[in-house]
Amino acid sequence: MSVELWQQCVELLRDELPAQQFNTWIRPLQVEAEGDELRVYAPNRFVLDWVNEKYLGRLLELLGENGSGIAPALSLLIGSRRSSAPRAAPNAPVSAAMAASLAQTHAQPAAAPVMAVADPVSVPTAEPAQASDMAEASSRDSYDSMADSAPAPVAPGRTEQRNVQVEGALKHTSYLNRTFTFETFVEGKSNQLARAAAWQVADNPKHGYNPLFLYGGVGLGKTHLMHAVGNHLLKKNPNAKVVYLHSERFVADMVKALQLNAINEFKRFYRSVDALLIDDIQFFARKERSQEEFFHTFNALLEGGQQVILTSDRYPKEIEGLEERLKSRFGWGLTVAVEPPELETRVAILMKKADQAKVELPHDAAFFIAQRIRSNVRELEGALKRVIAHSHFMGRDITIELIRESLKDLLALQDKLVSVDNIQRTVAEYYKIKISDLLSKRRSRSVARPRQVAMALSKELTNHSLPEIGDMFGGRDHTTVLHACRKINELKESDADIREDYKNLLRTLTT
């Protein structure tokens, strides 16, 4: 049987499978012909067992249909066709007689997404997965559901994988997005400290902050900075073993390792990296077995001087369901918040993205978008893409009028959600006072400070003038509103409580 027939059948299977599944489980396979027998090599037992269970039946069917019609002789082994002594799997050789039963499981293959690479990978599940609500489980069915609910968040063609040979057949694949670098990161007041800390780690790993813990809301640049560190480490040392993954993938890998009685291989993989970058660590909450394993992995890495970088959507002490010993260890290094970008940074982000897309974006147009899209960078970029597409399809230059047309539904929703009435109601609920208190003449600190916060938010989030805002706060003068805004801006610099309150309210009102 020829290798060409195998390649032909693999191409047919590519058309039947989602790209993520094909790239994860089929692409890593290597094949060589030995007489009438095909020897198929999987990089490790993870891949071998999964291919055997989920895809082998269909592969044998395709080989039979496109070959001579005779059941092919096929052996599954662990190793590489270039290795001198591959290790035979206990279930090899496999004949077509097994195809019927194996093909039954083909209808529901597991999706462990990964971008395509030319060379095989050894641990295919160590990649970023979308933050889905996957429960820790020990049964095969629970792992299937876990894998099926993890689509890749990285756009096709955006991920560069780098394979580094380590002990035995084990390889490390970084799964870093090559476009996320320090050069493409837009620095502003809201992320200045986080960017500086990330650069310090990238330029001086193991001797800087370890672990580095970045936290903040969705779409603020935490993942970008994490990838930037990884890319810089690999730029300095292409042989560095840098691995990025989502926390749910760590859970999925651990469950799979337990099922395959391969926990030692799992430990060896994660404890042999030079830098481990784990996104959205809050998904370890209430997963006791995963926390236990990560606790020991974390300790082993720090004791070995290897770099650890973590991200979360909240301050580590606020992650409910996370063991105190983990929270304590996360504080051993440096914990930095990534705040929502201020207006100037949002404008700079839009201008940089437009420049990268080779699109002319007038400054007043960027300012218009930035004023109205405030929640996070991801939504900001999404709005810009819509504007660019509208401009391209309509054959018109980007103007404020065109922006109003292309973002009509989004702007209407923003205007509906962010009104002075809504701000007053949200602030009153947050500080546990009555709306009537905000409109009253009371000057006690418990009322005056929330009133000033509400006025400052109204100025930032709405298009009302100062006199209009003052009128909606019990008929106050515009100078009162101006004083409130200046006072809150000063307190955000000096008072951590006010800064946190304002950030929380801003997130609530704009998300």
From Swiss-Prot:
Record-listed ATP binding positions: 219, 221-223
Q: Where is the signal peptide?
A: none
Tell me if Iron-sulfur is a UniProt keyword of this record: no
Q: Where is this region: Disordered?
A: 125-161
| Domain commentary | Domain I is involved in oligomerization and binding regulators, domain II is flexibile and of varying length in different bacteria, domain III forms the AAA+ region, while domain IV binds dsDNA.
Q: How does it assemble?
A: Oligomerizes as a right-handed, spiral filament on DNA at oriC.
Protein name (record) = Chromosomal replication initiator protein DnaA
